[in-house]
UniProtKB/Swiss-Prot annotation:
One of its GO terms (molecular function) is ATP binding. Keywords: ATP-binding, Hydrolase, Nucleotide-binding. Catalyzes the cleavage of 5-oxoproline to form L-glutamate coupled to the hydrolysis of ATP to ADP and inorganic phosphate. The gene is pxpA. This is 5-oxoprolinase subunit A. The keyword Hydrolase applies. It is an enzyme of class 3 (hydrolase).
Length: 244
């Protein structure tokens, strides 16, 4: 069994360099919620050095709230803003001898695109316009995955090690209790259940079906690196290969 392990990078956390030794894919902030041209270059350089797949992590234009504010943008605006961000990272990767492999939206752009078909379409269209060979990463079973498939893109369905799930397979909003799993044992058990058995127990006790093709590790948690190491070790014990 094989699984991709991804992390959001270039967001100002000191753990980036070490996380790049543990993950197989990096989602690099493109300036709209965090990061800038210099951090994008640095992250790309480190990803290439570690053999990690390079991806863009576009966001709503919301540096004040780290891309976590809901926005209602016209589809053409969402298309242009997404294309602008991923095009910049693609150029930076190419200039350093690398290749951008995937795109994963950030924060509320990701969450809204999981449910809003028009926004999902705008993002998928931007990814296709940039490079039809790119992989589009989205929440398992979401509108974004459906939109990507409609454009003929390769999609990758994502699950979260440290996020609570609702009965419909969506994430518990960060503003609600149960959104974040802080117990390491619970996060490990949830991840293995999703990867090995394709299901997750919701905060209300029901099982939801999920397709786990990539697991997100958050680099901003207090014990992010320790958990990443433990998850890698657990995957190795279970014969699960980590690869992009």
């Amino acid at each position: 069994m094989k699984i991709d392990l991804n992390a959001d990078l270039g967001e100002g956390y000191a753990s980036d360099a070490e996380l790049l030794t543990l993950v197989s894919s990096a989602n690099i902030a493109c300036g709209f919620h965090a990061g800038d041209a210099q951090t994008m270059q640095a992250c790309v350089r480190e990803a290439i050095k570690n053999g990690v797949a390079i991806g863009a992590h576009p966001s709503f234009p919301d540096r004040e709230n780290f891309g976590r504010s809901a926005m209602q943008l016209p589809p053409e605006t969402a298309f242009a803003q997404t294309l602008y961000q991923i095009g910049a990272l693609a150029a930076i990767a190419r200039a350093q001898g690398g290749v951008m492999r995937h795109v994963k939206p950030h924060g509320m752009l990701y969450n809204q695109a999981a449910k809003e078909a028009q926004l999902a379409d705008a993002i998928a269209r931007a990814v296709y316009a940039c490079d039809p060979a790119l992989i589009l990463v989205g929440l398992a079973g979401s509108e974004l995955i459906r939109a990507g498939k409609q454009y003929g893109l390769t999609t990758r369905e994502e699950v979260f090690a440290d996020r609570g799930y609702q009965a419909d397979g969506s994430l518990v909003p960060r503003s609600q209790p149960g959104a974040l799993i802080e117990d390491e044992e619970q996060a490990l058990a949830q991840t293995l259940e999703m990867v090995q058995h394709g299901r997750v127990k919701s905060i209300t006790g029901e099982w939801a079906t999920v397709t786990a093709q990539t697991v997100c590790l958050h680099g901003d948690g207090e014990h992010a690196l320790a958990f990443a190491r433990r998850l890698r070790a657990t995957f190795a014990e279970k014969g699960i290969v980590v690869a992009a």
